Amino acid sequence: MDERAVLEELKKYRKMDLKYEDGAILGSMCTKPHPITKKISDMFFETNLGDPGLFRGTKKLEDEVINNIGKFLNNPNPFGYIISGGTEANITAMRAINNIAKAKRKNHKTTVIMPETAHFSFEKAREMMDLNLITPPLTKYYTMDLKYINDFIEDRNNKNDISVDGIVGIAGCTELGAIDNIKELSKIAEQNNIFLHVDAAFGGFVIPFLDDKYKLDNYCYEFDFSLNGVKSMTVDPHKMGLAPIPAGGILFRDKSFKKYLDVEAPYLTDIHQATIIGTRSGVGVASTWGVMKLFGEEGYKNLASECMDKTHYLVKEAKKLGFKPVIDPVLNIVALEDDNPEETSLKLRKMGWFISICKCVKALRIIVMPHVEKEHIDKFLGALTEVKKN
């Protein structure tokens, strides 16, 4: 095949894909990247951060990106990487917790407390590292029960039983957008010398830029490195940061945690490697750097406000039609109660609407990303009404 034939053939496959701007993708935490990232991708498409000594400029960009993200997360000296996404970031944090625990006690099964609303990546980490995961009950606000956590840790300490090595708090859970009380979790972690990881894959590029008028009294919005107990955080630029996929992020409080991640790689220009994936494109790093420079703090504040306004519009219009949200929106994520979400979701898909469902509650899940407009919301609610009538 010649070049033209190859491109024409590829176009056929691309036409099979949904496009964000059409508004039918309502269940994804990703969105159409900022247009500047096309030009940046062309510039950095051959870079490989798996061998940073060969791509020193791109590595310098990564360091700057981590520092810039650290600034709005109140961490002046962050250590971390731009990696494939939230899954790799969460597994990396669990790897750090596991290695720290093993360094203290050789024959010890690492125990981590996390909510049942935690992302599926933690289940992958459990399988990989044979972790012992403890899931406390949820409050009516779909956050972890703090009393249960305190009692569980105290009971373990009193019995000299297997200690707790890690806690995971969620800042914008995948299904509902709820935010665990990271401030209180930080206190618990500090008092008991426990590693606290915050999964802010979604919320990391929303919460710091959220106007106070959108904040609910039932949730604590303090979640970042200003809390001394927080040791690591997942935050994904390819979600609300408008970077192209793949551009996830893992940040640690400082570089002292690197030794728990490093493996030797003597045949590369840097003899140690800490990320799970070895070969890493520099496109995500450079694109994140570019979008963050373009947007700045004000740009992300405006983006968060626009998405929250549309989120509240969705809830208001849904209520008029008799659809009830599971909780008031904490972030730009809405869960609408439904007796049979699997069936409803399947019917909507046949009509061209792609939403998702929750596992912790019977509900339809809608993410109001930047590509979602009010006209899309109106059309979707019309389709949902039609489905429920039939």
Curated annotation (Swiss-Prot):
PROSITE patterns: DDC_GAD_HDC_YDC (PS00392). The modification N6-(pyridoxal phosphate)lysine is found at residue 239. Pathway: Cofactor biosynthesis; methanofuran biosynthesis; Cofactor biosynthesis; coenzyme A biosynthesis. GO terms for biological process: carboxylic acid metabolic process; coenzyme A biosynthetic process; methanofuran biosynthetic process. Its EC number is 4.1.1.11, 4.1.1.25. InterPro entries: GrpII_AminoAcid_Decarb, MfnA, PyrdxlP-dep_de-COase, PyrdxlP-dep_Trfase, PyrdxlP-dep_Trfase_major, PyrdxlP-dep_Trfase_small, Pyridoxal-P_BS. Keywords: Decarboxylase, Lyase, Pyridoxal phosphate. It comes from the Archaea. Its cofactor is pyridoxal 5'-phosphate. It catalyses: L-tyrosine + H(+) = tyramine + CO2; L-aspartate + H(+) = beta-alanine + CO2. One of its GO terms (molecular function) is tyrosine decarboxylase activity. It is an enzyme of class 4 (lyase). It holds the Pfam family Pyridoxal_deC. Belongs to the group II decarboxylase family. MfnA subfamily. Catalyzes the decarboxylation of L-tyrosine to produce tyramine for methanofuran biosynthesis. Can also catalyze the decarboxylation of L-aspartate to produce beta-alanine for coenzyme A (CoA) biosynthesis. This is Probable L-tyrosine/L-aspartate decarboxylase.
